[in-house]
Amino acid sequence: SSLFINYKGRKMLIDCGEGTQIAMKKYNCGFKAIDLILITHLHGDHIIGLIGLLQTMGNSGKTDDLTIVGPVGIIDAMNAIKVLVEYLPYRVYVIENPKEKFSLEHDILKDIEISTIDLEHSTECIGYSLYFKRKAKFDRQKAMSNEVPQILWKKLQEQDTVIYNDKTYYSSMVLGDERKGIKLSFITDTRPTFEI
């Protein structure tokens, strides 16, 4: 099993069972821009596709870092995979059994807050919630009432501050109220638990 997520051109996977890369090829998902793989547990139907996928990612020209997150045992699993996959042209960071909310430092993925929950399964198993933060929408009236030059409108939607003609302009001068984010939870292979 596997869930593929495309967020602003960057890609993530939750689990990587056998056949994951075949399905990804079939639907033209691409391999180069995968930045994050979240593993729920170490049963074969959730991790066995990782060996081939890591090699395919390297063969596709990936050089950006990859982060793999998983339950207790993911570090040992990755060490075993390193024996089979001797060379990768990108760095792999492994986070084992995270308990606190976290975000990645990647320019785009830093907008995603990830939290975990322990699940009830025959082995260590993690459920994931991804909270996709959303920026406030552009407010034309606000920009005009704050006398922000139109040439800066786009920049202030992307940057917090812009200095123009010796005057400082802030994104809050052109943006409306904060928007509620989008939450995606992936809970699999568990008995019913109160925490869910």
What are these regions (language model features)?
Residues 19-69, 93-101:
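Active-site metal-binding motif and surrounding structural segment of the metallo-beta-lactamase
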Residues 5, 101-109, 162:
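Short acidic-hydrophobic surface loop/beta-edge motif
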Residues 109-195:
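Active-site-proximal loop/helix segment associated with metal-binding centers of metalloenzymes
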Residues 18-19, 42, 73, 143, ...:
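Active-site metal-binding loops of divalent metal-dependent hydrolases
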Residues 99-103, 194-196:
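Binuclear metal-ion centers of metallo-dependent hydrolases, dominated by the metallo-beta-lactamase
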Residues 76-82, 97-101:
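A gly/proline- and charged-residue-enriched helix-loop-helix capping module
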Residues 1-27, 65, 128-130, 178-187:
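Conserved beta-strand hairpin/beta-sheet module of binuclear metal-dependent hydrolase folds
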Residues 22, 48-51, 76-79, 126, ...:
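Alpha-helical elements of the RecA-like P-loop NTPase motor core of helicases
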